[in-house]
Amino acid sequence: MLVARASSRWALPGGTIKRGETPLEAAHRELCEETGVTGQHLVYSMQFTGLAKIHHVFFAEVGPDQTPQANNEIEKCKWFPIDGVDALRASIPTKRIVELVYNHEIRKA
């Protein structure tokens, strides 16, 4: 699932970790704030270091009863096939993280 702010590129849901928050707590908060998805079991996947940011990447399994909806500053929220993300107008870290996940999942299959 990717999100986009008004007139912006697609990106993975996320944001800044607040003071006193763990990366896991921030991931839960950002997922809820940006997509309305709550109560998910998040699993830490990896840390990805971009040019100016450190990205803590989590996996979440979203059940059929949870339909993501764009919230707050997010204008669009959409599911994409993992192998189609590279063709999107998306941030470089988003494309790289998805590529790493895709390659890892393909090797496991």
Region roles according to the model:
Residues 18-22, 74, 92:
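Residues at secondary-structure transition points
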Residues 107-109:
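Acidic/histidine-enriched, glycine/proline-rich intrinsically disordered or flexible terminal extensions
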Residues 12-45:
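The catalytic Nudix box helix
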Residues 3-4, 13, 46, 59:
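Residue-level detector of conserved, well-ordered beta-strand and adjacent loop positions
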Residues 1-12, 39:
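N-terminal strand-loop-strand
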Residues 17-18, 84-86:
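Short histidine/acidic/glycine/proline-rich micro-motifs that form metal-
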Residues 2-4, 35, 74:
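Conserved short hydrophobic patches within well-ordered secondary structure
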Residues 46-85, 93-105:
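Active-site-adjacent beta-strand/loop module that shapes the phosphate/pyrophosphate-binding cleft
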